Amino acid sequence: MKINFMIMISLFAGSMVSAQDSLNTISGKPKFIAFSPSKATKNVNGMLIKYYDEIDQEIQPKKVNGVGLGFNGLGIFFPVLFLVNITSINNWGINDIGSEPLPDKMNTINGMQLSIVNMEPTVTNGLELSLSSNISAPSVINGVAVSPLYNFHHTTKGVAVSTFANVSQKCRGIQVALINVCKDSRGIQIGFWNKNEKRKMPLINWNFKNKKL
């Protein structure tokens, strides 16, 4: 009798949890911990765990108020390729990075993005800590971006700090790295070699004037 009663309680509890998950999915209620890719993940107030990235055409935009964690294993190989090709850095097509227009569908993270690599278009409002930055993903940082290797963004508003390179289409703030590149800049570049729309200079470069049409 007791066993039957416990089984009934367990089944009832399981059905309640399942029903609650279904309601959350239907209502779009924010989740505290969510995983991606998942059709059920749209709004997160807490932590998003992303185990691989969706391609641009398939991305389902997600809004995260909290922390976004990216564990895409492909990011481990980019540092290796970087180190192998470090001697040919002058031949890199870094001027093309970030030249794509921002897509209509983008993730939004209000808080912190911590990842091995990000390959989904993302707007980060806060802190971005990444090993291999944003690859094949036009992204925006409003705040601070830090990487032990390089930062690649479409738009940087704030501070970008890395060891080797910061590359952006549009910059409003400060870039600090061995090499800094920005096509539309309002701010300061500090590094061994710096390039903006007006000039190329070692050590320090700047521009505070609007681009002439």
Report the location of each language-model feature.
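Bacterial Sec-dependent N-terminal signal peptides
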Residues: M1-L23
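Surface-exposed, glycine- and small/polar-enriched segments that build interaction surfaces at terminal
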Residues: Q20-L213
